[in-house]
């Protein structure tokens, strides 16, 4: 009996025995055949299969054979037409006589006089139909190659045939509609009408380069057919040529199907319609393998048939680039074998790279950020060049959990002194550069998942820490632990790689019945997010107790360092006596077993909390997104969440002591959107979506407050309006399922609820789709660009541009953000808006940090809520296949989309508000301004957009603004009550006994919303409309005065930054912006309220009124200066505002 490994080797290695007559074919047949295939037994006896198998397997051989055969047939026909092939003399004479008799009365319907028949030189002796047949075959060949080119460029077969149908329509219009005679079909008007019809169809279907080629070919074919097909009527000749073209395209489609596809070509059915043009920028695509010339050659010489890549370079594992089943089939049992060869670093190559970077640094035209990045790489290379070559054996991928192996850069090891940066170099480098040097290659530092330097402080040590703790084999869930993990060198090891390796193993084990996927905030799968996710698992949010409204209820709730996550597991390899289900901590995501109930029980309000004891731990990987906004405190990971799990005494100020957290439970059925998926009684309100003051609270009343479907309904309408369902082939049911589960996960709290998420989603949609005066777009005519996007890694629908159906402005004086932001990035912005406050507890980041909440410990006190929102929302997305509405995105697109969503959510942290505003102001005031072809600039614009949408309440009309103000104040008061019950100092504006509503809103507008709107407006990105001269003369009083204060100077700055000189003619024109008008009006309203309160307080006690009055007058003066000089940079105001934050 053959061993499976031997069978696999027989499949992969050439077979030298078997069929003696055709050894090559037999070898290929054995190589490609499936052992279980029924063809395997009969392939030896089928001589035709043995001969054709090499042709089918080799793309070059099949293409060469096809081209050669067609060329031979064409040459043969041409020679027959010219009479160069011998024929019977009597037949030639008979053909000549018949030709003379037929030519005597004249050709009916002919265009040019003269004899019919073949070409000069003996062609008349042949059959009179041979020349037309040869000509039609030539036209068929021409369209064959053109059709093959179109199909391989991504054009579908019906669209290609539709182009020729458009030509037929043009011919019918010329001959029947316009009444052009047969003698004038070659005239310029007739040809112009036909080619115009073809050009119109081409403009909608093809890119510019393909369209020009199609028009040129069709024009030439039409002319040749009208001149040369003399055996047919003139009116029939173009249709015969088009018929030959259809046959040629059909033949091309058939040939394309039988020829093997290239590895880089995407499936034709996934390209979609080409109605949306693509972008100009080149999108990098993952290659299957990267090699270093000298290193790989040395490796191959030392280990014969085994080839290795340089593990010092980052690489995406193959199992992420293809399905697990395909990867397992390709690698076979050999994938688990370990090679003990060493990895060498070529010092000469590093020296050459250092020299190239030094030459680049000598260029004075490089931007400062590029120079800084290159200087960082140069310093790293120069440091490594002082050391000898590093030899480090590869780690055996089969790692036993009982070995307690550790591979963390932040811990002591024998190789750390060689790999880490010397302390003398760390002291000599500036902090910003040091953070860049220590960064890791992950999705945080690269939007597309490729290795690029990111100026954000991403620390390598935090993202590369992996620990495999010792676990007894008798653990109840030991079968669920990853037992095989491929580890690369620590310098290139990332969290995304570690998790993907673990998930690859877990996917195999969890494919068995009863296996459940473990959801953890730390996991971030890189490949298809739902591979390996069983159908029996679900993450469901169930709120045990809502936030209390008084201190009495908060004092009665239970304590717990872990939020227990219990579920039942079943596995085939579990022993029957194990009945205790494992418990998962929902804060850190790791399983732990419950200890003895008698061991130090903590009882409060009748609830006993047992101290957990850790028995098992899977690979721990800290998320890269935790370090986006970090300070320069330390490069060593602190496992505070692990310490929190083992901590027995609970502090009084713990967040768990104040409220019962939501429990995540694994259920048998997912949360699915109810029927009907789209509610049909909301059309009257949904028609107002294109207004800034959308009546969202009226929509809540119509839907029903207890229904909770507002987010999914509005999301569907906005996605459908933008055409995103068609552009990305989004399945509607999965889309509605996820967004319904997402809105259910929002808690019923006063402000940060599903209504707020819907309002933010509507705001970002409005800011990106409505007309913006003076904004130039990178595309024209709604999606038509140049033909320079054919090398892009994405299809047109994915990297093209989408427009709202409500955007019907044809004036080039207006533009919109959706014309500058690709569709994938725009959809990521919308999804981020829907996710951005998911599972918000109704407390601020400062409160969670002060009370040492589990989330604060998990995310190291940095952007705690924002990290939690993103992690929880993505965990929900990856928990069920019913939620995967991004199923048609490939690996690179999904990684890019996930990166954009997370970055947009993290940007909503108000602690980083002034940093974003200052960075954006610097970009706007730069000579170049916003470069829409730069992905980083577009990301910054999207971050500013979602920040403005998140705090858009003061920019709404008075009625909506007061409703939102009531919600945030009530939520603040609940936090103040809890702080008082815990003995903590009450945060400003959160004391229910001393309300300061007017001061809160006035300060928030003056210091937060005002500067943000000012920066956004100064960049020329605020929707509005030009104020015509007639409107200016008709306006009086307030509107015009307010417009003179703010938008007029702003338009000067906008026009100066525009590249087009035409915009300078509108330098003096005014812009009416509804958003800024509401902001100014609401600010004036709160100032009047403050003045009235001060006046009433002054009547009672004049002496106590002096200090607050002077302080308020300073704030009022500051906002007046802002209104009058809105176009000026606000750099001098920011330092005075930060202390107020």
Curated annotation (Swiss-Prot):
Residues 1029-1056 have a biased composition (Acidic residues). InterPro entries: HD/PDEase_dom, PDEase_catalytic_dom, PDEase_catalytic_dom_sf, PDEase_CS. Keywords: cAMP, cGMP, Cytoplasm, Disease variant, Hydrolase, Isopeptide bond, Manganese, Membrane, Metal-binding, Phosphoprotein, Transmembrane, Transmembrane helix, Ubl conjugation. The lineage of its organism: Eukaryota, Metazoa, Chordata, Craniata, Vertebrata. Changing residue 445 to N: In HTNB; increased phosphorylation at S-428 and S-438; increased affinity for 3',5'-cyclic-AMP; no effect on protein reaction kinetics for 3',5'-cyclic-AMP phosphodiesterase activity; increased 3',5'-cyclic-AMP phosphodiesterase activity; no effect on inhibition by 3',5'-cyclic-GMP; changed function in cAMP-mediated signaling. The keyword Transmembrane helix applies. Binds 2 divalent metal cations per subunit. The modification Phosphothreonine is found at residue 1036. Its main location: membrane. It is found in: Membrane; Cytoplasm, Cytosol. There is a cross-link at residue 1120 (Glycyl lysine isopeptide (Lys-Gly) (interchain with G-Cter in SUMO2)). It comes from Homo sapiens. Changing residue 445 to A: In HTNB; increased 3',5'-cyclic-AMP phosphodiesterase activity; increased function in cAMP-mediated signaling. The chain crosses the membrane at residues 61-81, 130-150, 160-180, 185-205, 210-230, 232-252. Its EC number is 3.1.4.17. GO terms for cellular component: cytosol; membrane. This is cGMP-inhibited 3',5'-cyclic phosphodiesterase 3A. The keyword Phosphoprotein applies.
